Amino acid sequence: MDPNMMIVKTLSETDCSHDNKLILPRDKVENIVRSTGVPVPRMGIQVEILDNTNSYWVNLRQSQRGYFIGRGWGELRDARNLKAGDVIKLYWQNTKFIFSM
């Protein structure tokens, strides 16, 4: 696994709130964007997150402060019963993120 394609994140209260947004580290996402050549338009891009046997389609977007996963995050968060303090990993492989804890 290429560590440059991995996002490791400790979930915050904001990530687990009803705002349904997962804030991502700007430097990690920009590294993935540079490596893959896949741009993230202002309105976002649909990406798939695989979690064992489940697939979740989410919207990866850019804001003035960085990147976040919006639409679709709440479904994954609730399915995995994620809470603030949990550590998650998103590994970019081909055209999707692979989720792990």
Swiss-Prot record:
Keywords associated with the record: DNA-binding, Nucleus, Transcription, Transcription regulation
SUPFAM superfamilies membership: DNA-binding pseudobarrel domain
Highest rank taxon of the organism: Eukaryota
UniProt signal peptide: none
GO MF term (any one): DNA binding
Residue ranges the UniProt entry marks as DNA-binding: 7-101
Coarse class of the protein's main subcellular location: nucleus
GO cellular component: nucleus
Localisation: Nucleus
SMART domains, per database record: B3
PANTHER family on file: TF-B3 DOMAIN-CONTAINING PROTEIN (PTHR34269:SF15), TRANSCRIPTION FACTOR B3-DOMAIN FAMILY-RELATED (PTHR34269)
The protein's name in its UniProt record: B3 domain-containing protein At1g08985
